[in-house]
C-alpha cells in the first residue's frame, strides 16, 4: 500500500485556500470488471467503512447503486456513535465505466471540501491497481481531517481485501 499527502492550492467559494491531496493506492487480486461492479454498490461503501464510520442516510437508506449526477445526504457517526460534520453530502460527479473511475464532490460542516476519486486500473486478468485520491479542505481542521482520512482510507483498502478473500457479494 502506498500513501502520499501533498499540499495544494484550491478554490473554496471564490477564495484560494490551502488544502491537501491524499492518495492511497494498492494492488488487489480481483478482476477489474468484478471490482467495478462492486464499487458501484452502496452496500460496499457501508462495508468498507464499518466500524470506523456508520452512515444514517437522510430519507432512510442509500440507493442500491450509485448514479452519475445523483446527490445523496447522510449523517456520519464515527465508530457508530459520535456524530461528525453534520449532514454529509455526496454528489456523484462522474461514474465512468470505460475508464473505471467513480468521482464524488462531498462536503459537510467540518470537511468543506472532500472530493474523492476512485480509479481502478487493470494489471492482469485477476489483479488491479486501486487508487483513492481525496482533495480535502476543512479550514484550520484540514491537517487533522487529513490525518484521520489517511488512517480511514488505509483501513478501507484493507476491508476490500476481506471482500476479495471471502468473495463477499452485494445486492
Where are the regions that the model predicts?
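Hydrophobic ligand-binding cavity/cleft-lining segments
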Residues: 1-67
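Generic short beta-strand segments
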Residues: 7, 72-77, 133-137
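Short, surface-exposed coil-to-beta transition loops
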Residues: 21-23, 84-90, 112-117
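A short, structured loop/turn motif at beta-sheet edges
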Residues: 31-33, 64, 93-100, 119-129
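Glycine-rich portal/gate segments that line the openings of hydrophobic small-molecule binding cavities
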Residues: 46-47, 56-106
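Short, highly charged C-terminal tails/helix-capping segments
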Residues: 57, 61, 162-171
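Beta-strand/loop substructures that line and gate deep hydrophobic ligand-binding cavities in soluble
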Residues: 103-151
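A non-catalytic, amphipathic alpha-helix used as a structural packing/dimerization or gating element
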Residues: 151-159
Amino acid at each position: 500500500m502506498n500513501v502520499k499527502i501533498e499540499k495544494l492550492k484550491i478554490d473554496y467559494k471564490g477564495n484560494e485556500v490551502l488544502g491537501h491531496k491524499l492518495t492511497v493506492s494498492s494492488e488487489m487480486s480481483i478482476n477489474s470488471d468484478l471490482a467495478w461492479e462492486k464499487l458501484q454498490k452502496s452496500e460496499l461503501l457501508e462495508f468498507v467503512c464499518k466500524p470506523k464510520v456508520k452512515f444514517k442516510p437522510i430519507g432512510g437508506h442509500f440507493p442500491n447503486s450509485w448514479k452519475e449526477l445523483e446527490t445523496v445526504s447522510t449523517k456520519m457517526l464515527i465508530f457508530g456513535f459520535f456524530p461528525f460534520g453534520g449532514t454529509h453530502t455526496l454528489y456523484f460527479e462522474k461514474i465512468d465505466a470505460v475508464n473505471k473511475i467513480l468521482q464524488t464532490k462531498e462536503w459537510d460542516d467540518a470537511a468543506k471540501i472532500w472530493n474523492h476519486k476512485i480509479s481502478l486500473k487493470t494489471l492482469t486478468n485477476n489483479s488491479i491497481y486501486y487508487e483513492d485520491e481525496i482533495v480535502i479542505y476543512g479550514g484550520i481542521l484540514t491537517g487533522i481531517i487529513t490525518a484521520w482520512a489517511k488512517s480511514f482510507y488505509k483501513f478501507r483498502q484493507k476491508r476490500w481485501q476481506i471482500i476479495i478473500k471471502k468473495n463477499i457479494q452485494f445486492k
